[in-house]
Amino acid sequence: MRVIVAGAGGDGRSCVLEERDARFDEVLPGLAAFGLFNTSETPPPARPPGRGELVDLGVTAGLCIWNLWRHAPGLEVPMHHTDTLDFEVILEGSVELILDDGAHLLRPGDCVVMQGADHAWRAGEQGCVMCALNLGTTPRS
């Protein structure tokens, strides 16, 4: 299991900003936690404009939607960006997260924090099921 935090780099291109393997710390006997990501303000700030299509998920700043997404085998979702901070967990199958810096293969247990940057998806041979929580950010001006 690992977490990938993706967003826009200093040049405005989408990239992996951080990648870590899960390392659990015991908080109580027999109970351990691994911190994936923290926000510092609510609603989260506006994200830089992307070059891909803006997909409006209809999420008001500070509110969220929570979905399971099933990607058919080989499905390609074109490059796009959203006005959301997304938290995704791969549950079944595999999928490539495609950023301006390349393709990143994700398998069950992998987690992604997508900070509104350009990205695309390409499902593996068995398809993919992911759980996604999308938190609305402040709209871009």
Where are these regions (language model features)?
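Short acidic, glycine-rich loop/turn motifs
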Residues: 8-10, 99, 123
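Ligand-binding loop in jelly-roll beta-barrel domains
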Residues: 49-52, 62-64, 72, 96, ...
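A short beta-strand-loop-beta hairpin characteristic of the jelly-roll/cupin
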Residues: 76-108
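A short, N-terminal "cap"/entry segment at the start of jelly-roll beta-barrel domains
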Residues: 1-69
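Active-site scaffold segments
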Residues: 88, 113, 131
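Short, surface-exposed charged micro-motifs
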Residues: 4-5, 87, 111, 120
